[in-house]
């Protein structure tokens, strides 16, 4: 019922997530942040079972920060993605698996921007664009049609809005507000939330 999306540009990664926290068919909150700051230039987006998402994301977050304190430098997005995948895979084979779907976005001085897609079975893939949730079925075709590797930030935001408008039109559930952030060489930046008003019938 949740939705995550990421778009990688030539020198940035644009990500967005819905802000609804739901329990079964009940909306509990409409201002829930599903993005977790791993380091100055790495962001983890996490959806899934309510308890699992926060517990797993915070566990990864604290371990990435511990790595920096021990070694004096931060993990690269690639290293953070592989560390996250390994932990998710280990938990999957234990008595306490986490049911979480993830996007990891980051920027590295040497490798540039990176976007990683990971599902609850710990399958990891580097992708130019990615989405999680039922909304992904409705928007991946739009991303495939309009995405280019050299897409500018302005065009990426337009493409993001096009995807979210498609969700409002075709998705039966109400996801009215989305958090939007950009990761680039200067760090993580908050963009203005994208909000849709309910259509009157």
Swiss-Prot record:
The modification N-acetylmethionine is found at residue 1. Pfam families: Proteasome. It is found in: Cytoplasm; Nucleus. Keywords: Acetylation, Cytoplasm, Nucleus, Proteasome. InterPro entries: Ntn_hydrolases_N, Proteasome_beta2, Proteasome_bsu_CS, Proteasome_sua/b, Proteasome_suB-type. CDD domains: proteasome_beta_type_2 (cd03758). Induction: Down-regulated by theophylline (THP) and 1,3-dinitrobenzene (DNB), two reprotoxic agents thought to induce infertility. It comes from the Eukaryota. Its main location: cytoplasm. GO terms for cellular component: cytoplasm; cytosol; nucleoplasm; nucleus; proteasome complex; proteasome core complex; proteasome core complex, beta-subunit complex. Gene3D superfamilies: Glutamine Phosphoribosylpyrophosphate, subunit 1, domain 1 (3.60.20.10). One of its GO terms (biological process) is proteasome-mediated ubiquitin-dependent protein catabolic process. The 26S proteasome consists of a 20S proteasome core and two 19S regulatory subunits. The 20S proteasome core is a barrel-shaped complex made of 28 subunits that are arranged in four stacked rings. The two outer rings are each formed by seven alpha subunits, and the two inner rings are formed by seven beta subunits. The proteolytic activity is exerted by three beta-subunits PSMB5, PSMB6 and PSMB7. Non-catalytic component of the 20S core proteasome complex involved in the proteolytic degradation of most intracellular proteins. This complex plays numerous essential roles within the cell by associating with different regulatory particles. Associated with two 19S regulatory particles, forms the 26S proteasome and thus participates in the ATP-dependent degradation of ubiquitinated proteins. Belongs to the peptidase T1B family. This is Proteasome subunit beta type-2. It comes from Rattus norvegicus.
